[in-house]
Swiss-Prot record:
The gene is rlmE. SUPFAM superfamilies: S-adenosyl-L-methionine-dependent methyltransferases. One of its GO terms (cellular component) is cytoplasm. Keywords: Cytoplasm, Methyltransferase, rRNA processing, S-adenosyl-L-methionine, Transferase. It is found in: Cytoplasm. It comes from Parvibaculum lavamentivorans (strain DS-1 / DSM 13023 / NCIMB 13966). This is Ribosomal RNA large subunit methyltransferase E. Pfam families: FtsJ (PF01728). Coiled coil: none annotated. The active site is at residue 199. Residues 1-18 have a biased composition (Gly residues).
Amino acid sequence: MTNSGKTGGKSGKGGTGGARALKVRVKTARKRSNSSTRWLQRQLNDPYVHAAKREGYRSRAAFKLAEIDDKYRFLKPGGRVVDLGCAPGGWCQVAVARVKAEGGDAGAEGRHGRVIGLDYLEMDPVPGATILQLDFLSEGADDQVKELLAGEADVVLSDMAAPTTGHKQTDHMRIMSLCEIAAHFATEVLAPGGTFLAKVLRGGTENELLVLLKQHFKTVRHVKPKASRADSAEMYVLAQGFKGRSESPLDDAE
């Protein structure tokens, strides 16, 4: 985690541009495993890691959100955003800039944006955002968020990932379960017409989540931004046009 606290660029476009850098090779140290060496080498050679440092983002993941929003335009000036599992804060930085949460031009409804980040981990403040050290599963968390927003949210974001085990199917099931829980929370706090964006892993059950979300959102799709590593099973589910709360909660829908 950095202490820069910068909002960073507003779009992430061209963030990896410039002259091509020489690749760094890392020797395996005596107390460093081969997998750790590969991870370190990948980080040192990752253009998005360098771009994040250059533009003041706390993580390379900021470019994933920026790229998705560049195409689908759901982070609008004046918007109210909830970021679940927000540490270290890269997505909050992007959201703050795009919804004008630090000031600037107000949105279409004459209001400035609002960004609420939730994480059970302690983290440095993000200028322009309200950070709560809170488990979003705790009782009353949804009501607390709506109170801080002075209404319902326009966007709910989740870049959360469950701790990995190294077993692909287990990791897939864990993150899909986490995504479903986040989706249920989203249906409790979103305003009609709202957007839900969450990380998932390919593994066999991701289409079941699409079917479930289509009952509550007008448009549901999978997206994979260029900032997601090509060899990763990671992708995102983007659900737009929330239909509003029904009598049947999302997790009871079939």
